[in-house]
Amino acid sequence: MLERRCRGPTAMGPAHPWLFSGPSQESSQPNRGLRYQGKSVAQPGGPAPVKVHRCAHCRKRFPGWVALWLHTRRCQARLPLPCHECNQRFRHAPFLALHLQVHASAVPDLGFICHLCGHSFRGWVALVLHLRAHSASKRPITCPECNKRFWRQKQLRAHLRRCQPPAPEARPFICGNCGRSFAQWDQLVVHKRVHVAEALEEAAAKALGPRPRGRPSVTAPRPGGDAVDRPFQCACCGKRFRHKPNLIAHRRVHTGERPHQCPECGKRFTNKPYLTSHRRIHTGEKPYPCTECGRRFRHKPNLLSHSKIHKRSEVSAQAASHTGSHLIAAEPMAQPALGVPLGSLRTPAEAPASLHSCTDCGRSFRLERFLRLHQRQHTGERPFTCTECGKNFGKKTHLVAHSRVHSGERPFACEECGRRFSQGSHLAAHRRDHAPERPFVCPDCGKAFRHKPYLAAHRRIHTGEKPYVCPDCGKAFSQKSNLVSHRRIHTGERPYACPDCDRSFSQKSNLITHRKSHIRDGAFCCAICGQTFDDEDRLLMHQKKHDA
């Protein structure tokens, strides 16, 4: 909020002389929150460029530096993280950590210094990671295995499932050949294929008999067999490897060790490539582009699965463009060039269908499990239940994303402003706020928007559509927020309470109007001429005279 009392420029102290120096004056003090050295933007039809003044906190732009200064005071008052040295406020902890090193370090060469313990770091990312160690001591729940601390018992249970090796009684399926145990039946079935392959190799060797003397074959086994080719053997299951790093990575299957930890969300992995692939979720990196449509993917298997869609469409197009007249030869040849009779060759139209189709909507899927997941949309089945609130979900990924609402986890961070999100889709939508492009254009008036839902809501102004109907009185609204606000009339809900008295309101605008009654006369003071106003809006209107 704006300053409640008129103290004048001199009452601010000599520490902030740059607040009252105009754009033409130079100041050695670095700007805190103000950026009046904005880019010059030429107005269409005007000869001289106009400077753009941008707020460093919310990126809003203002035509004059006075309006920017007034806005910055209100913007900083709403920020949750205050600096205890100079009372400046910040929205995100990394920005506060960057600011604190100005107070903590008198010598710039020391780098980034922790204000709690005095440790210095070369980069601010290392300082932010170090600050987490101080906050970790306040977490009440401790892991009995690795002493890692958590805020909630649910986070500890999820952590124990990752870091604790499974107990012997949790592996009831035992292989009869080597004695290795497994937690699931399908894992044992996959493992038994190793012994089947070994038995087939032995039977083939006995049937072929000893190799003739002479020059050994390229594929002839060396003396000692696997002991020479694969000298590194696992002491738990007897599996052999050619290289020692492969054996070390394999041992983690038995020990449950996960040494590679994600610095963003704390999830651990057995191999570094798994961690590298996982970190792309936080960074948003998608290094695998499709050469057909340009769509990008985070993992290579996803790209390979996507490319099959284009291949199937090409096959369907070829089958539709060709007719049976030139696919069938007049006189079938006895032996084509490839050595296969033409009668045994199948055209793309005759190829067996390997897709699984939905009986309700006709949509096809490559795998049956994808079809089962899709059919839950028609049946309404929601087998995954949240243990905290009992809400049901049709997909496990939706349950995992929902659980972050209870745990408070926000693993997806914006590189521009540091704001964190619980879902990657929310981060992708937020990134458009930083981008200058507005790809969604209204065909009626030409107004552009960054997000498609904003365009859909705007178009209802032209069409007059009101899809949101109140179930109590039947009144219709074009925006869902208007319906939510209207329903408080029927429910009697008043979520906006005045902090100065006991009154509460159903609309936020009514609360803002009411709070002006608590403000004393002359509470809002102009920093340029000293004139006072009872209303903040009147002060802003007055400031436009100075900007002009």
Swiss-Prot record:
Disordered: annotated segments: 1-47
Tissue: Expressed in the liver and in subcutaneous and visceral adipose tissue.
Keywords: Acetylation, Cytoplasm, DNA-binding, Metal-binding, Nucleus, Phosphoprotein, Repeat, Zinc, Zinc-finger
Zinc finger (C2H2-type): 53-75, 81-103, 112-134, 141-163, 173-195, 232-254, 260-282, 288-310, 356-378, 384-406, 412-434, 440-462, 468-490, 496-518, 524-546
Residues bearing the modification N6-acetyllysine: K39, K272
Assigned GO CC terms: chromosome; cytosol; cytosolic ribosome; lipid droplet; nuclear membrane; nucleoplasm
Modified residues (Phosphoserine): S27
Biased composition, class Polar residues, residue ranges: 22-31
One GO BP: positive regulation of D-glucose import
Superkingdom, natural source: Eukaryota
Single Gene Ontology MF annotation: chromatin insulator sequence binding
Subcellular location: Nucleus; Cytoplasm, Cytosol
A Pfam family that the UniProt record links to this protein: zf-C2H2
Annotated signal sequence range: none
Record's subunit section: Homodimers and homomultimers. Found in a complex with RIP60 and RIP100.
Role summary: Sequence-specific double-stranded DNA-binding protein. Binds ATT-rich and T-rich DNA sequences and facilitates DNA bending. May regulate the expression of genes involved in cellular fatty acid import, including SCARB1/CD36, and genes involved in lipid droplet formation. May regulate the expression of LCN2, and thereby influence iron metabolism and apoptosis-related pathways. May regulate the expression of genes involved in glucose transport.
Protein name (Swiss-Prot/TrEMBL): DNA-binding protein REPIN1
